[in-house]
Regions:
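Structural WD40 beta-propeller signal
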Residues: 19, 29, 74, 121-125, ...
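Asp-box/WD-like beta-propeller blade repeats and closely related beta-sheet repeat scaffolds
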Residues: 57-58, 67, 72-74, 84-123, ...
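Surface loop/turn motifs at the tips and blade-to-blade linkers of beta-strand repeat domains
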Residues: 15-20, 59-65, 105-112, 161-165, ...
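Beta-propeller domain segments
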Residues: 1-9, 117, 134-137, 147, ...
Length: 348
């Protein structure tokens, strides 16, 4: 299957581990353990104990959780996001074969299943960033936690809204030099009764949040200026922070990372890699690939290109769906795939 993946000249792709059913969000431990969340009930830990760039050992950290998509690592501890809870597994890399009982950090997040799976990461400020998706295709809730990115102290205190108007982000990262947050967002579905319009509108988004308190438009506006047919007349699109890049509609942009490794050439420094999970309701499928966004000197998005593709066949059938990306300690790019139940390693 991997022979079908096309990459820029000089790059190659290989399997990184034994099967990881439903592999989604990725987090790296200080000892090199790769933690993998899923949308089922299980969290995995992958270990490459002999240094051959293949994780031959797969541990199960938990197998009774509620959609533990999000994983994050800090100070020796693993944080796991369920739909309405954040858990912490202390000193996890010392107990991979026999994980400790988790500590509940917070258990008051909304419990809606729709867009309820969460991607989590610690920011440069030491806070844990936790998105709460809109509990619908398009709607408005009085609770400001919905369609937002929240942040909270590691102990669960001082939960606050960082960004508003974010329909469903499943991936974000901070610029390595400026510490500015960038994130993907998935556009709404069925915006029109015209199938051709639905196929190409509204866009998915790559956004930049220079400060707290910004509003990115949902549910009133999508992309830079696409008014929502239900809510759009209530607000003007110029009131909101527009995306840095409008991604093709329905590519399902999920995980993203700035490239900070040394394996790739210098031209790849600080490039954003995006895992596009792929469309589910477009007449001609799109996505199912990893793309690359380059920034200019002012840290604005300047170009968007395909980096790795081939999970989608010419007949419109996809055998794999990229979910998250992560830069390994040696500079390789790891890619999770929840359809194939795999983690790949892209190297040069």
């Amino acid at each position: 299957m991997l022979s079908r993946i096309s990459l820029p000249e000089g790059f190659s792709i290989s399997l990184y581990s034994n099967p990881v059913p439903g592999a989604r969000s990725l987090a790296l431990g200080v000892r090199g353990t790769l933690f993998v969340g899923t949308r089922s009930r299980t969290v995995y830990a992958l270990s490459d104990t002999d240094g051959d760039n293949y994780a031959e050992t797969v541990h199960i950290i938990a197998d009774n959780l509620n959609t533990p998509n999000g994983v994050a690592f800090r100070d020796g501890d693993l944080y796991v996001a369920e739909v309405n809870r954040i858990l912490r597994y202390d000193e996890i890399e010392s107990h991979l074969a026999s994980p400790p009982a988790p500590v509940v950090i917070i258990d008051t997040l909304p419990n809606d299943a729709h867009h309820g799976w969460k991607f989590i990461r610690f920011g440069p400020d030491g806070k844990l960033y936790v998105p709460v998706g809109a509990p619908c295709n398009v709607c408005r809730r009085n609770d400001e936690r919905y369609a937002a990115i929240l942040r909270v102290n590691p102990d669960g205190s001082n939960l606050e809204v960082f960004a508003h108007g974010v329909r469903n982000t499943v991936g974000f990262d901070w610029h390595p030099e400026s510490d500015v947050l960038w994130f993907t967002d998935n556009g709404r579905d069925n915006i029109s009764s015209d199938p051709q319009i639905n196929d190409n509108s509204p866009p998915d988004e790559l956004n930049r949040a220079r400060e707290a308190g910004l509003h990115f438009g949902f549910p009133y506006c999508h992309g830079a200026d696409v008014q929502d047919p239900q809510f759009g007349l209530e607000r003007n699109c110029n009131e909101f922070t527009p995306p840095q890049w409008e991604l093709p509609a329905h590519v399902a942009a999920l995980g993203m990372r700035f490239y900070t490794g040394s394996m790739f050439s210098a031209s790849w420094k600080n490039v954003i890699f995006i895992a596009e999970h792929g469309s589910w309701n477009r007449s001609t499928p799109i996505g199912y690939r990893v793309t690359a966004v380059r920034l200019d000197e002012s840290e604005k998005a300047a170009s968007y290109d395909v980096f790795a593709q081939g999970w989608l066949g010419s007949d419109g059938t996809a055998w794999g769906r990229p979910v998250d990306v992560l830069v390994a300690p040696d500079g390789a790019l790891l890619v999770s795939d929840d359809r194939k139940g795999a983690v790949y390693r892209i190297s040069r």
